[in-house]
Amino acid sequence: MSQARVIYFGAAAIYLVGAVVQFFLAGLGVFGASSYDAHRAFGLILVLVTLVLLVLSIVGRMPRTTIILTVVLLGLNVLQMVLANTDVGEIAALHPVNGVVIVFLAYELTQRSRRYVASKMAA
């Protein structure tokens, strides 16, 4: 079994935790801290983790659906930055909705990679 697959699973789990942390940081921006600087900076880190996930999914020869969903996750991350930087309120309001979709997709990718790694280890 490819090490990239195991690393993908670990990185996906880290990404999932990071996506949840993003909600906390956004909450701090609303209810505590005076700015969203930590939320913005951490969001950029998550984009980089998504790029790493994409490379690992390809190098590790993950199932095609996992690779495609990883590309979708990257696209949602880019969309997240666009939504956060628009001046149209109705469009910007989709930013937290997209964040929820990102968390669910990150969970799905973590579960898929866990099952895939477990099945390859058992074989």
Kindly give the residue locations of the regions a language model identified.
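Polytopic transmembrane helical bundles with strong interfacial aromatic enrichment
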Residues: 1-123
